[in-house]
Amino acid sequence: SDLRATKGAIDAFRAMGKQCKDVSNGLPTFISPWIDGKKAIMGTGKLTREDAVSVQQHEKEWNEIFDGIHEVVDACAFQDGHIDYDELDAFFSVNKKLADRYGMQCWTNAESFDRDMPINFLPIKFDKLRMKLEAAKRAGYDKAITFEFSHFMSPQSAYLQAGHLYDRYREYFEIK
């Protein structure tokens, strides 16, 4: 397989993972990369792009990366915001399969802001966040984290919608 596309990522993740392991006496490490999907459009002025990575290409690239880093990276929490909602199950099941293959944990990094709006960025509607979390659950993910709680989900946020999103999240998960 042609490693040129992934070699830089492997070298960087392996070096950082090893350094973290060395300075922490072997504590667990995780990475949270993006998926190069149709919403990976920073700086283009568009809402989507045509040349997004396919599920098959994603699987090939991340199989190579995980093969090169699994000894020093314990978990991977892919950011979910660059792929479309109808692609969640396909990408998430591949991510989980690869993590399992290499003995890594598979987490989701559920973005709590909305990329589908012309205004960058507003808190996401709860139904969209719920869809992403439910897809992670269907795929058998180990944990969920979010980016970025303090701006887009905290009751203390300047965005009124953030407090509402937090309330809906607590209701859904029956958190008192």
Stretches with model-predicted labels:
Residues S1-K176:
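Glycan-processing catalytic domains of CAZymes
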